[in-house]
Amino acid sequence: MAAEEGRRLQMKNGEGVGRSGRPRWALWIAALMAGALWWTVHSDAVALMSKACGKDAATTPRAARALRGRFLHITDIHPDPLYVEGSSIAGACHGDPARDASDRAGRFGDAMGGCDAPMDLMNYTLAWVATHLRDEIDFVVWTGDNARHDNDRRQPRTAEQILHMNAQVADQFYELFQQQRDGDTMQGVPVVPSLGNNDVFPHNMFSLGPTLMTRQLQRIWAKFIPEEQRQAFEHDTSFFVEVIPDRLAVISFNTLYFFKSNPLVDNCNDKAQPGHALLLWLGSVLEEMRARNMKVWLSGHVPPIPKNFEGSCYNKLAWWTYEYRDVIIGGLYGHMNVDHFYPADGKAAKKSIKRRGKARTKERNTQEQPLDILDDSVDNLFSGRGAMPLRKEKYMRRLFKDVYCPIAKRLEDKGKQEQSYERYSMVHVAASVIPTFNPGFRVWEYNLTGIDNAVAPAPWTRLVRRAQQILSPLRKKKHGPDRTLPPKKPKHLAAGPGHIPQALTPIRFTQYYADLAEINKDYARELEAGRSHDEAAAAAFRYKIEYTSEDEPYPMESLLVRDYVKLASKLTEDRTAWKTYVRRAFVSSGYRDN
């Protein structure tokens, strides 16, 4: 107790220590030094950024694209320019001779091998999407991690490499999706990126801006960020895009400000914390979206699940999603590589905060929460495991026991089922492109009834001004209500598209995957038949449908919150359904815990 009291007193004077045990001033210096490294970049990286920051697509009037009622969610590519086909998988696929055939790195990677994605895997994936999906989707949600892991001590990552690769991947996404096509008369497909924990240096550590790092990211992503939001982005690396003007937006928020593995984050209660500022920004955006009768998808890299986020950050965000269930459709995230859903209980989060005196305490939130992600270490800047899956079956068993089983028990009370549905919001965690398992991504379909894409977007002047005031470090902090807590949803507002069938309600999805074992065999067979390497790759590489939301053994009528809550309950009762769910969670790779 004395030690904790001393820590609180030190924090009051700005001299606290982070959870790594290092002095807080040392952590801030480390962050500043990392930012300085990002400023000193190779001329090639600068050239990439200059290319990326050329003509702003938003400055030229263009015809609206016909809506298709579909969008793409893709995440965690982790391209590795050091990857060498045929080298040792045990050596991170970085050029060491393979010990035997089982240790030989395939051209497109090997599921569960632990290596990052070959550049060919990224390039062929995007080429496949361009051929088969690009003209059939309305927007792209792209949730981060665009650099390799720091999994090779002989070749540690540098800030320059991370910056260069982020710029390169951003260019590819822009040219594939958002750049004007059809003679510069037709709008491209909007792309909404978000920041991953491996997109920063050192990984996981990221402070509130403006910093050299946030400015560099703004330059790289300028073509994706609406011009009026770019100044605020330099503070919180968060923004939103009207993917359907005046009807639907995607909010990209920086989950690293809530992330337990960020040593600069302690909670979301103290005004000096980055998560506190981000919640103020998010609240203002949601308030304006409600005023305009718009709906939103939340998106970010790290999924908001307990112990993935700091306790107060998780509870506050879950409460916001509950009180804004008329606005928020759901959340789209990456990071964990496991294809699954997590129902966030907003009412439970609200009760937890109220029990703690409306979150005004400065003590660390030590509430026991289920589902520690098990994978991240605050202190280890070196990520020795890389893409290797670890204890994922154990994670799924805990998801079953700690989350899905209590839902099933709650649904036993037939009289309270409707209330049980509305208390939840859905956290959708996506499969990744990196071959932690097999590469995968998802195409969502949604209701287009009554939606017109030809509406001109209205200006966001009031909201932008408000956001700048919130994030300004010079703004005088006034005492008053805690605005990181949401207001109660007005009773006259019905629940939104995530809960009640209406325009923009998600109705089905298709999960695509690349079976790497099959692809690598076909590639070898094509080479043996005398084809060139590129001809063999073109013939062998493909994505195919792994499953859809309508497939047995647990077909879903639609993708409302109630459908997911019912599915969580069904999975606890039907052994066949659960086994299929776990197999799909690991992207049909056959993964088992060692």
From Swiss-Prot:
Side of membrane Cytoplasmic, spans: 1-24
MF terms in GO: endopolyphosphatase activity; exopolyphosphatase activity
TM regions (residue ranges): 25-43
Keyword DNA-binding: no
Modification after translation (UniProt): Processing by proteases in the vacuole may be required for activation.
One of the record's GO cellular component terms: fungal-type vacuole
Gene Ontology biological process terms in this record: polyphosphate catabolic process
Biased composition (Basic residues): 475-492
UniProt similarity note: Belongs to the endopolyphosphatase PPN1 family.
Name assigned to this protein: Endopolyphosphatase
Biological source species: Eremothecium gossypii (strain ATCC 10895 / CBS 109.51 / FGSC 9923 / NRRL Y-1056)
Lineage: Eukaryota, Fungi, Dikarya, Ascomycota, Saccharomycotina
Gene name tied to this protein: PPN1
